[in-house]
């Protein structure tokens, strides 16, 4: 059931597609060539991963697989745009992105100023964008959403919001 206006649907789909770029890029690269990912991420002569940690093929492959799992959830959210699925995808993305950002805020010593700014900006966007999109899922149509919650929540009925 679609509960958003066409503008909200478009905004959500664009935002989810942008979010999906990171897990697609990281997930595919780290899964297929873990050593290349470690040595060369994010590309263009930059070496953000190898600058802050030792190589561990198992860990890099696991990170790649986890990013691919996140990509699958985002893809389902993009295709179906079901409120709870979209909210779960966005919250889980932000939950993973926040400690990642916090760690990298404390591990900037081996990076140039430009790389530090680029890295932290990208990581911060991975926290802020899903939270901003999450706000879209509770605005506009929020009355319809509340009504659907009343109808679908266990032990609740539309006539009795407290059950």
Give the role of each language-model region:
Residues 88-104, 124-129:
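Hydrophobic alpha-helical membrane segments
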Residues 1-26:
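Cytosolic juxtamembrane helix and N-cap/initiation of the first transmembrane helix
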Residues 53-78, 95:
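Core segments of alpha-helical transmembrane spans in multipass integral membrane proteins
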Residues 5, 71-91:
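Juxtamembrane helix-break-helix junctions at the cytosolic face
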Residues 21-59, 64:
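Hydrophobic transmembrane helix segments
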């Amino acid at each position: 059931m679609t509960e958003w206006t066409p503008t909200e649907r478009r905004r959500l789909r664009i935002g989810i597609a942008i979010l999906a770029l990171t897990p697609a890029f990281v997930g595919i690269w780290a899964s297929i060539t873990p050593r290349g990912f470690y040595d060369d991420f994010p590309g263009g002569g930059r070496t953000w991963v190898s600058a802050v940690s030792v190589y561990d093929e198992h860990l890099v492959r696991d990170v790649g697989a986890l990013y691919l799992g996140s990509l699958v959830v985002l893809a389902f959210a993009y295709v179906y745009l079901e409120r709870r699925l979209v909210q779960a995808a966005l919250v889980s993305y932000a939950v993973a992105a926040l400690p990642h950002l916090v760690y990298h805020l404390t591990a900037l010593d081996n990076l140039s100023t430009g790389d530090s700014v680029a890295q932290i900006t990208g990581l911060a966007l991975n926290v802020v964008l899903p939270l901003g999109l999450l706000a879209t899922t509770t605005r506009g149509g929020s009355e319809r959403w509340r009504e659907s919650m009343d109808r679908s929540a266990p032990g609740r009925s539309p006539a009795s919001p407290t059950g």
